[in-house]
Amino acid sequence: MSSPLDHLKTQLQRAMVAAYGETLSGADPLLVNASHPKFGDYQSNAPLPLAKQLNQPPRTIASTIVDHLEVGEAWEPPTIAGPGFINFTLKTSYLASQLELRLTDPRLGISAVKLPLRVVVDFSSPNIAKEMHVGHLRSTIIGDCLARILEFLGHEVLRLNHVGDWGTQFGMLITYLREVCPEALTAPDAVDLGDLVAFYRQAKQRFDSDPDFQAIARQEVVRLQSGEPDSLHAWQLLCAQSRREFEKIYNLLDIKLTERGESFYNPLLPQVIQALDQTGLLVEDQGAKCVFLEGYTNKAGDPQPLIVQKSDGGYIYATTDLAALRYRIEQDQADWIIYVTDAGQSTHFAQVFQVAQRAGWIPNRIRLVHVPFGLVQGEDGKKLKTRSGDTVRLQDLLDEAIDRARNDLVSRLEAEGRQETPEFIDHVAQVVGIGAVKYADLSQNRTSNYVFSYDKMLSLQGNTAPYLIYAYVRVQGISRKGQIDLEQLTEQPTLSLQEEEEKLLARHLLQLEDVLAQVTEDLLPNRLCQYLFELSQKFNQFYDRCPILQAEEPLRNSRLGLAQLTARTLKLGLSLLGIQVLERM
């Protein structure tokens, strides 16, 4: 369905050109949500920045634009407020008619895009032979959320897991395991991932301190790269062991990924060097092959190179990322490539993108985006660690969230005198615990660090997953109490929006499409979280102040329709965040 906001934006742009000529063609009408409900639903701030350009007072500009504006049947006549804001209010009759259409639409009025794009979302990307830790949490959750939203809007999304499954560390680990635990290289499940991580640390210490061991490990890398059967088999076993552990976490988080690790691109690395050489970008510096970057200098002020092949012939991360980028453009035919990693890699990706751009690999149609995020911090404001100072294992973090959610639920059941089955308790604990962790992350602006707090994220009060899930549960409670299937109301409600709480809820229900469009533009999932939080607040105000089951017909059916739309919107919105809902909790 056409968004009333899109229509208004188009009409405003036409009015600005009609009032002041083609100089304002393409000018942004600066439409935003009204600062307060008393000012209406939206306001245009455009007259204020135009005052200097047009040499007129903002209120005069606002009045002139309004004189040329045809808002259409959806809107009340616009008003001018303050220094020159233009305020717009949707007609109550229009609100009701639009919501009635959404009652029978499984997509809640949100159209799929007319021109779907092929989108690659690169996220999660743990390292083989290492456990997933809290540092992988944000990439995994943010990347999955963006992929879900893009898929829902009709784009063709390839979710890629660029795992670290190649490099010197495997020569080091295989060499060490041959000495201390050879069965790990010949039999599956001979050691668990925790043991493998410990062996990896020991191998690294040996590699750093023992030149003879280091030389053997480097020879092992050569054997692996040349495809020696025993080395290749050992590597495959290590990868399979890690993969099984990763899958446990992905299943718990309900994450779907296509694994395409660094090893996939290994055969393509010589082609990257050759292609860069053919473009004239490649420079040899102290035996290494590199590309000197524009806009980057070292401390001495000299141009900074991006090394793509070391003097010993080895490759680095940048080479692999260039090969991956080229493959995604040429073979995957991607229109849009999104990399979801921590902010510390921003410079790396800016440099990789620059080299690919200068090499002529990126057609104009391609949109390349790095989606950076901040750190997960402990209550002390420092990087989240265990009490012993180790990195927090992601499995431990998720297990504790579920355990705490279970304890909270059991305490509440005891206080209420309720009896529930162990299966019910386990299911609710998992949905609430996992949902709380996801929502606590996604509700923050991803560019900021955030403090990880189980107490805050599991609270039934405030901007949390339990609060939103409980709002959904309240609607299901209406259904049970009234013995009504809200999904199958006996007659199509004619919505009657009389009370202010009904109107505020109705207006908010119509905004989801605009919110998803904004998230698609700036890739900030917290916008969707804020929308759902405000929806829950508005529903709770409506629920507390407007009788539903006790109301007389046709008002009763109208309010049941509003409750049904709220539940469906919450369920859809939470599913786009990767969070399940509950019928009871």
UniProtKB/Swiss-Prot annotation:
Keywords: Aminoacyl-tRNA synthetase, ATP-binding, Cytoplasm, Ligase, Nucleotide-binding, Protein biosynthesis. The keyword Ribonucleoprotein does not apply. GO terms for molecular function: arginine-tRNA ligase activity; ATP binding. GO terms for cellular component: cytoplasm. The keyword Transmembrane helix does not apply. InterPro entries: aa-tRNA-synth_I_CS, Arg-tRNA-ligase, Arg-tRNA-synth_N, Arg-tRNA-synth_N_sf, ArgRS_core, DALR_anticod-bd, Rossmann-like_a/b/a_fold, tRNAsynth_Ia_anticodon-bd. GO terms for biological process: arginyl-tRNA aminoacylation. It catalyses: tRNA(Arg) + L-arginine + ATP = L-arginyl-tRNA(Arg) + AMP + diphosphate. Its EC number is 6.1.1.19. A motif ('HIGH' region) lies at residues 126-136. It comes from the Bacteria. It is found in: Cytoplasm. SUPFAM superfamilies: Anticodon-binding domain of a subclass of class I aminoacyl-tRNA synthetases, Arginyl-tRNA synthetase (ArgRS), N-terminal 'additional' domain, Nucleotidylyl transferase. Its main location: cytoplasm. Monomer. Belongs to the class-I aminoacyl-tRNA synthetase family. This is Arginine--tRNA ligase. The lineage of its organism: Bacteria, Bacillati, Cyanobacteriota, Cyanophyceae, Gomontiellales. The gene is argS.
